[in-house]
């Protein structure tokens, strides 16, 4: 029977890498970040609603959402962040639901890649939650390198979410990503074997 698994973690813990690895085992991925971009793509109803709230500056010269402009506003104004979420979240849910149901109808196991799964209280929309775990210090280092952020900015982003330790305690399974990609792959393979998704190579 097909299962719906929520993959989450903290910022820069390696969720995308885990999703990428899972596709090789036949899982289908429904990505919240991709759905979020789809919700406000050029010419969409969602983008038109964003423009109504944030003004013409919210649209760049290519007719797409000016993410930097909108991002800076919502980071400093919680009320406008809430207004943006009220536009985007229902559209994202609809996109993800359609994608998920399509995969389930064809008998696939589905991975719902949702960075803010616990923050948005979506744990009851999936059969299980798997958290990709790494330490906060590694999160901060990766974020500084990947996004070219200062130490203070990286810490602010990490601490704006529920801590990775708390998420791990709430999860059905924790995938350790304290090492390199090979170790991550081995840890993931072990979980898939234990849960019966794949056969052990030693069998």
From Swiss-Prot:
Domain annotation DPCK: ranges: 4-203
Swiss-Prot/TrEMBL keywords: ATP-binding, Coenzyme A biosynthesis, Cytoplasm, Kinase, Nucleotide-binding, Transferase
Any one cellular-component term (Gene Ontology): cytoplasm
Catalytic function, reaction form: 3'-dephospho-CoA + ATP = ADP + CoA + H(+)
UniProt EC number: 2.7.1.24
Predominant cellular place of this UniProt entry's protein: cytoplasm
Domain of life: Bacteria
Pathway: Cofactor biosynthesis; coenzyme A biosynthesis; CoA from (R)-pantothenate: step 5/5
Gene3D superfamilies the record matches: P-loop containing nucleotide triphosphate hydrolases
GO term, biological process aspect, one: coenzyme A biosynthetic process
Keyword Cytoplasm set for record: yes
Binding site for ATP: 12-17
Location of the protein in the cell: Cytoplasm
Single GO MF descriptor: dephospho-CoA kinase activity
Function: Catalyzes the phosphorylation of the 3'-hydroxyl group of dephosphocoenzyme A to form coenzyme A.
Similarity comment text for this entry: Belongs to the CoaE family.
Protein name: Dephospho-CoA kinase
């Amino acid at each position: 029977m097909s299962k719906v698994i929520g993959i989450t973690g903290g910022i820069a813990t390696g969720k995308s890498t885990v999703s990428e690895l899972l596709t090789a085992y036949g899982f289908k991925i429904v990505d919240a970040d991709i759905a979020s971009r789809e919700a406000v793509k050029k010419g969409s109803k969602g983008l038109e609603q964003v423009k109504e709230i944030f003004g013409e500056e919210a649209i760049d010269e290519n007719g797409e959402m000016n993410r930097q402009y909108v991002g800076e506003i919502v980071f400093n104004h919680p009320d406008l962040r809430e207004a943006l979420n009220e536009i985007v979240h229902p559209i994202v849910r609809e996109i993800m639901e359609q994608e998920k149901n399509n995969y389930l109808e064809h008998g696939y196991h589905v991975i719902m890649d949702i960075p803010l799964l616990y923050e948005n209280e979506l744990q009851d929309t999936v059969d299980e939650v798997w958290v990709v775990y790494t330490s906060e210090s590694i999160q901060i280092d990766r974020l500084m390198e990947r996004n070219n952020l200062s130490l203070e900015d990286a810490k602010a982003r990490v601490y704006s979410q529920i801590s990775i330790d708390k998420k791990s305690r709430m999860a059905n399974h924790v995938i350790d990503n304290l090492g390199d990609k090979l170790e991550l792959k081995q840890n993931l393979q072990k979980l898939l074997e234990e849960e019966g998704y794949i056969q052990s190579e030693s069998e």
